[in-house]
Amino acid sequence: MSLITNAKLYPPRHPRAVHLAHHLAAIAPGVLVTAAIAAAAVGLRAIPGMPGISPMLLAILIGIVAHNGIGTPSWAVPGVKFSLRRVLRFAIILLGLQLTTAQLIEVGGEGLAIIAATLLATFCFTVWFGRVLGVDRKLTELIAAGTSICGASAIIATNTVTRADDEDVAYGVACVTVFGSLAMVSYPLLQSVLNLDAHGFGLWTGASIHEIAQAVAVSFQGGQRAGEFGTIAKLSRVMMLAPLVIGLGMLARVRAKHQPAGDHTATPPMPWFVLGFVAMIGVNEFVAIPHEAKSWIVAITAFLLSMALAAMGLETDLRKLAARGLRPALLGLTASLFIAGFSLALIKLTGWHG
């Protein structure tokens, strides 16, 4: 009777509930670490001379120094990965609440043409220059995708069809993260030198900087309008990820048609958070959000993006750039310079101002 009574009083926990509890326990420490770094980055802005520096930029720098100085503890890794993926995507979705369809239309056909031309030219140039340098084809394609579209997310998505070694994936991610971080430092310094207005600077950052969070952080360094426009431009670029992966998948199947063993088809991933971003723009268009609530949303979004940048820093191992020699690193650097120069040239040649 006692066993029956105990079974009624303490029914067995549902397996899904147990799994969820274990998952939350695994990611909590790392999420707290990224939140602490984000809080420190926000707090550092109170220091005289620091207010003009984005907390997102400070967060990734703190993360890089911490990871390469003392290392990221193993117990924090699950939460760090969660912040880099889920938290980042949720923050991007929330960014939609700061935008309207009128702003979305501002990119226009010419702006989209600049973004598309930059993407295609950068990918083709990187693949060609990789052959010139003698870099492995798979690693070259990963660096090309990461540089031309959206950094680590594009590399991971592209690898579903490229099927490179884990070391190549790690190298490519480190490459685009490091050179994207350098762009975060240099771009704001060049805005006035290059005589770019808010729209021009936003388009330049959105069309050329690798990671979404990096592009958002840099574009907002040029002001609210530049930040909003840079976000739209960058998300427009991300939408081109699926077509690129489809094209690479078709190319991979052509290469593998004489290999009878193994199915080389792959379903290209859809960056679903882009749909959430667009949905939030629609919400902002048709729902009257109080000004005070919008202020909180802006602050929360910036904090979540800082968490994602902190996680990116905590996964950036500078030694990985040296592990496979200098040629792939040279390829990544050259590709980064190419996309910056090509997109800027198109903006200047077309006289684009939004």
UniProtKB/Swiss-Prot annotation:
Transmembrane segment boundaries: 21-43, 58-80, 87-109, 113-135, 142-164, 169-191, 235-254, 269-288, 295-314, 329-351
GO CC field: plasma membrane
Membrane-topology annotation of the record: Multi-pass membrane protein
Main location: membrane
Subcellular location: Cell membrane
Disulfide bond annotation, renumbered to this chain: none
InterPro entries: UPF0324_pro
Keywords: Cell membrane, Membrane, Transmembrane, Transmembrane helix
Family: Belongs to the UPF0324 family.
Name used for this protein in its record: UPF0324 membrane protein RPA1770
Organism: Rhodopseudomonas palustris (strain ATCC BAA-98 / CGA009)
